[in-house]
Amino acid sequence: IYIKDKMVCDIVKSGFVDLGVVGSDRIHEGNFENRIVKIKTLSKISWPLVIAIPLDSSIKSMSDIKTIATQFPKSVNSYLDSVDLREKIRIIKIQGSAEAMPYGKWLGKRIDAIADISITGKSLRNNSLIRLGKPIAVFHPVIIANKKSIKLKNKMAYYRQFIKK
């Protein structure tokens, strides 16, 4: 069945389907790491999570940023923890087009930067944004399974013949 990527983990976890393919970002952001089983990472495909700032911004490094708008707060916080900046940068969780956020205020707060998926950079360029440094995370498609289904040997043996290809 074809469904929105936001729903794949929930539907697999519920047992409605045995297997699904979803981005590792959805697994991480939705806290599904312990609620589904990762069968295989399809590592030939990837998409980077980047920090982007307006072209005319005075920001030179991550330590200059006060606020970041993103659909990926857990991933951004993981990165900020790794560079010891989590306490200094406020994360604002948004849904939808992050690219417009640095050009206005969100609930009265100025947004310094965004964290968003950028494969080609075209959307960033179209919105006069530039990447700040290297990607902070890289995501991949993952084949996932329902925890109960994985225990059924006949069923998983059947699926494995397709997964190996």
Could you say what each language-model-derived stretch is?
Residues 1-165:
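Domain-level signature for soluble enzymes in the chorismate/prephenate branch of the shikimate pathway
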